[in-house]
């Protein structure tokens, strides 16, 4: 989207986006750090799906580490003072880690689908070494598919602008290519995940008709709902705003362009939300993760009570 001279500044939107990115960073780092600890110290049996989940954790942590810089960018009124190269590197890291996370979410869904719906396929006999090999290929593939030309910034009189979440101007062929890649990286995984999960639910309903096995079906349904909610909440708004960008890109009205930029900022910040929601998927994948998160929550509650107890005793002594 071509940027014009009309100002698109909105303190409310910039503060909201900056605050949201800060929360996503904190929650994403905490949730995925606990998951990483669980992988190293609590998970006793590693299977291919665990390898894919581990790579998802790494991708989410990588995404969370880039968010503080963009949060500061928005909280400072879209003023970027770190220079051209850091802008390029961080934008690449943001797009790359986000794409890797989506790829491993899709891989986990496909792995569960094949193991439950088609258990006799030879692909289900993959070794851990093969799973690590597939994971390495996914990382390399996403390096190639991450649009390099997105990572551009433009110098202004007072600061350097680092466009974060909306398409930038450039050659038409290059811009079209990066948009096609974006839609493929979102819509193709969403369609594949929806297909795999619907087939998984149908198969479980046929096989687990006994009343004592219904909790497994309910558990699977909840997991499917979480994954679909994750995609719908995180990526659907961004897809819609990208469509609006192409519909209204010929409009010269400043108000229209301002609205598109603000909508793109909000929708773009939502695409990073999946790193904070992924721990819910870990909990449904293995009880070890549920135990770790409960242990952390109990520890935090215990510290809060310990911090509140001195004031309570002081108040009681003077009553």
Swiss-Prot record:
InterPro entries: GPCR_Rhodpsn, GPCR_Rhodpsn_7TM, HCARs. One of its GO terms (cellular component) is plasma membrane. Residues 38-52, 111-131, 202-219, 285-319 are cytoplasmic. Residues 1-16, 74-91, 153-180, 241-265 are extracellular. Glycans are attached at residue 5. Its main location: membrane. The chain crosses the membrane at residues 17-37, 53-73, 92-110, 132-152, 181-201, 220-240, 266-284. Disruption phenotype: Deficient mice exhibit a reduced response to enteric bacteria, showing defective dendrite protrusions of CX3CR1(+) cells in the small intestine. Under ischemia/reperfusion injury, liver dysfunction, cell death and inflammatory induction are consistently and significantly inhibited at 6 hours after reperfusion in GPR31-deficient mice. It is a multi-pass membrane protein. GO terms for molecular function: arachidonate binding; bioactive lipid receptor activity; G protein-coupled receptor activity. It is found in: Cell membrane. One of its GO terms (biological process) is G protein-coupled receptor signaling pathway. Keywords: Cell membrane, G-protein coupled receptor, Glycoprotein, Membrane, Receptor, Transducer, Transmembrane, Transmembrane helix. Belongs to the G-protein coupled receptor 1 family. High-affinity receptor for 12-(S)-hydroxy-5,8,10,14-eicosatetraenoic acid (12-S-HETE), with much lower affinities for other HETE isomers. 12-S-HETE is a eicosanoid, a 12-lipoxygenase (ALOX12) metabolite of arachidonic acid, involved in many physiologic and pathologic processes, such as cell growth, adhesion, inflammation and cancer promotion. 12-S-HETE-binding leads to activation of ERK1/2 (MAPK3/MAPK1), MEK, and NF-kappa-B pathways and leads to cell growth. Proton-sensing G protein-coupled receptor. Interacts with KRAS; in a farnesylation-dependent manner. This is 12-(S)-hydroxy-5,8,10,14-eicosatetraenoic acid receptor. It comes from Mus musculus. The lineage of its organism: Eukaryota, Metazoa, Chordata, Craniata, Vertebrata.
